[in-house]
From Swiss-Prot:
Tetrapolymerization of the monopyrrole PBG into the hydroxymethylbilane pre-uroporphyrinogen in several discrete steps. Keywords: Chlorophyll biosynthesis, Porphyrin biosynthesis, Transferase. PANTHER family: PORPHOBILINOGEN DEAMINASE (PTHR11557:SF0). This is Porphobilinogen deaminase. The modification S-(dipyrrolylmethanemethyl)cysteine is found at C248. Binds 1 dipyrromethane group covalently.
Length: 320
């Protein structure tokens, strides 16, 4: 009896250029590791891709860039989905898990400037310079350090945002360095913003692959892409965010590092106007990263983080 060939593995992806570059990288790595298997990409648009005329914080962020892919996984239409980990909620739908975290690229935020500001760094931009960002996290931290700058919401994919900058709608943009690097646009990075000024988003720079919890075949395939140090760092970050009941659209930032078996997690919570900014740090063994995230959340809550976040949740309510 001749055995039937293994079924194709279906990978879910958003349709944006960055999402496809990331998904095709995963597809290529799996094809290289498992040359006898077939990996097909299926694309779909998410709510976050479709609604471009409303600030992200006003839409709400529960599955904004992931829900449609998750529905497809639960329906058996795709086997796993590739996400920018920073877009993946810390609480996943029942039946789905974070199956793999890939090696992280530079998680820093980057300053991209219009040509007329090419001789400036972030700290030398003149009063009234218009900075484009859709992130409340970046907004709050930059307002804290540079209250003389002006900030304006910017939506759309990376190419759209850069086109708006080049057309003069903005003087500068704050973007994720990893996204620019993955799209071969590293030359647009004018300055990497130091962690002392802007802590990055939870999971920024890493890819998170979401799959069905009860799918041992897929989980086994994904093991080959897991990068343990990145996973440990991101587990700590995600536990911190989850405990604070924050999403990707609140002013919560992190930074993590591993040295000699010790993981150090720095976290930040800020008010929208940037006037109140809480920042603290914990260190501990890499063997229990989630415990570190929970400990740091408790420390910041004791300093008033919950009150700051409650005010934000009352102010920035998702539109119906």
């Amino acid at each position: 009896m001749v055995s039937s060939p293994a079924r194709p593995i279906r990978i879910g992806s958003r349709k944006s250029q960055l999402a496809l570059v990331q998904t095709h990288w995963v597809q290529g790595e799996l094809q290289r590791l498992y040359p006898d298997r077939q990996f097909d990409v299926q694309t779909m648009s998410t709510q976050g891709d479709i609604i471009l005329d409303v600030a992200l914080a006003k839409i709400g962020d529960k599955g904004l860039f992931t829900k449609e892919l998750e529905v497809a996984m639960l329906a058996g239409e795709v086997d796993f989905a590739v996400h920018s980990l920073k877009d993946l909620p810390t609480r996943l739908p029942e039946g789905l898990i974070l199956g793999c975290v890939t090696e992280r690229e530079d998680p820093a935020d980057a300053l991209v400037v219009h040509d007329r500001f090419k001789d400036h760094q972030l700290e030398t931009l003149p009063e009234g310079t218009v900075i484009g960002t859709s992130s409340l996290r970046r907004l709050a931290q930059l307002r804290h350090h540079y209250p003389h700058l002006q900030f304006k919401d910017v939506r759309g994919n990376l190419n759209t945002r850069l086109a708006k900058l080049d057309a003069g709608e903005y003087d500068a943009l704050i973007l994720a360095a990893a996204g620019l690097q993955r799209l071969s646009m590293a030359d647009r990075i004018h300055q990497l913003i130091p962690a002392a000024v802007s802590l990055h988003a939870v999971g920024q720079g890493a890819l998170g692959i979401e799959c069905r919890a009860e799918d041992p075949e897929i989980l086994e395939l994904l093991k080959a892409l897991e990068h343990e140090p990145t996973s440990q760092r991101c587990l700590a970050e995600r536990a911190f965010l989850r405990e604070l009941e924050g999403g990707c659209q609140v002013p919560i930032g992190v930074n993590t590092a591993i040295a000699d078996g010790t993981l150090t997690l720095t976290g930040m919570v800020a008010s929208l106007d940037g006037q109140r900014l809480l920042r603290d740090q914990v260190s501990g063994p890499t063997s229990d990263p989630e415990a570190l995230g929970l400990a740091l959340a408790a420390q910041l809550k004791a300093q008033g983080a919950k009150e700051i976040l409650d005010e934000i949740f009352a102010t920035v309510r998702p539109e119906a």
